């Protein structure tokens, strides 16, 4: 809720309630090797969690399901360490504005924050606001042996690793895009989920029966449409940047991707899709008006809520279909970062480590929040009573395996989203894909020349 601010100091022990979750087989998700940048010493050293007893940490969080869950266990951290946690939870846009103001002023008032790496990664790195964590991860007097950095999924580690190989944050949450589809309608026809873009289009055409049912939907609204666009772009072999960090838009892959994206929405989406954000797409899907929808996997909770959704229990979840250039899923990663201006850097790191530990990742997944650790998906508790459909867990894991950054790693991500977003809107409205890509290329190259020096 925009404008809402929550401040807190944890004061009493929180108890974990066992959640009923889905039965799913253990599937290995390739983690990233620590490599030479974060190596493990031969001798084990016990972490002294009480070394900063009496310290008060100031934390900033953007509103997020992961945050809602981890806050419940703050008293546990305080008991473990003897530290106190002061924290603020505010909407992401306002939170980032506050963070930028304080970082620019150099106040040092924030010790750690829950970073949106897909927006902040390069900008904050170039500004020197991330405290590099490589040495902390290497130091066994600071990092518990069972923390298991190699348990983090490859896409999550890539999201927090900078071009100079410094690690800027510890991953908390990874949101891949997946395919939502009307399983009941597919079952009636003996279909499984589409495996290729061509199959997806064929099924959209077969199911499209307006105004009662539309075959397909994705975001059409400018800026918002930049996130699903990544999937189509990668599927056709497109890249954001050339090796020398110039615009890579002026290629046939971008034009082909735009032809597919705009064409699918013109032919098979509900009227007015050019102004659809995730909310409008989700609403149409939940009302039973759309057969297939591509967006972030964590929208599933509302689809399965009978109080909100007419299609609860009728939704299938699948990894995105492969395209001509390969199989990809855009991912968006959040992570706990230590401020380079903090006066309590090591203490703040202990909090970030605790928050992203196996124990807390397990708690998050049991609460229905996707996590960056591979091992968590094999929890025995997940094999108990299902909280979500089997296909949700499988789609999530399959998507983590093929995850790829959903936005370009540049300083001004927001401006890029506006540039490509307007181009997509114009193409949906009927402009020639080659023309809108040519104009977007000029604008994007100008942006890079101004901001990437």
State where each predicted segment sits:
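Hinge/lid segment of periplasmic solute-binding proteins
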Residues: 45-51, 117-176, 228, 312-318, ...
